[in-house]
Amino acid sequence: MDIWFQDETRVGQQGSQTRIWAPKGTRPRIVKQQQYLYQYIFGAVCPKRQDCAGLILPQVNYDGFQKHLEEISFHIPQGRHGVVVMDRAGWHTKKKLSIPHNISILYLPPRAPELNPQEMVWQHLKDTYLANRTFSSLEDIVDACSNAWNAFSNSKKLISSLTTRHWIHLI
């Protein structure tokens, strides 16, 4: 059995600002955009297998989440079962949701994002790749999200260090 942690985050022109190094006595300038173009990254990680599954979509809704469940299902090896841990967002709890045969859903308690290691992934991606920058178009946002997600997903050591918790006991 594999435990997967799933979540979504928004990335766009109203991005985040983070601290940066600057010479002593200077104030660095950071551009803040006024436009509102954005995309969402749907992401899931499996700390035990150091694997992840992600999609970049224009909105969060039932259809996008259904596609993400199918993507997670694709990443689960034949003969294994995945327990996907997630919050109770409205699109996660629809009755018409078609859950793949190799996945079970486990919902986190309300208002407990600290129990989802995927939140650390978002913080890392935003701090390292997506903060303190501007985006000229939707394609620019998608490219930046793709580059950030690919850099993360190609580093098994980073997946492990950001998402492994001592309280995750796997079968």
What are these regions (language model features)?
Residues 1-171:
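Short functional hotspots at interaction and active-site rims
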